[in-house]
Amino acid sequence: MNNSYISPFAKPVYVMLKPVGSVCNLACEYCYYLEKGKLYPEVKNHIMSEQLLEKFIEDYLECQTMPQVLFTWHGGETLMRPISFYKKALELQKKYGRGRQIDNCIQTNGTLLTDEWCRFFKENNFLVGV
């Protein structure tokens, strides 16, 4: 894709990534998402594989027509994936980003936040929603 010309009519594409599906460490009464796992009873593991992560990032960046791209990580509880998963995501964003500005936001219930997570988010400019 040639990004040297961006149409004034170009529209960004937005999606939320759910790297753990509906898996969560809480069972909040108001949560609309806990029941979603029951929609696919044959699927025992709703965790995003690294192969799917790479394919998604490559395809998502390929379809973007804007110079700035946003990745929104949502759950279930996103921090149930290890930091290494998100480090891999950042590597893949750089690999397939073709120099574009890439931003990341992540939604968490906050119960699994540690100093290590906070350093990672700060060092990589994640917008964190709790």
Where are these regions (language model features)?
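Canonical Radical SAM [4Fe-4S] cluster-binding loop centered on the CxxxCxxC motif
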Residues: F9-Q51
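Radical SAM/AdoMet-radical enzyme domain recognition
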Residues: I57-E58, E62-T72, R81-V130
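Alpha-helix capping and helix-loop boundary segments enriched in small/acidic/polar residues
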Residues: V43-I47, E77-M80, C105
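Short acidic, glycine/Ser/Thr-rich loop/turn "cap" segments at secondary-structure junctions
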Residues: L39-P41, F71-G76
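Well-ordered alpha-helical segments embedded in enzymatic catalytic cores
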Residues: L52-F56
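Cysteine-centered catalytic environments shared across enzyme families
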Residues: M1-A10
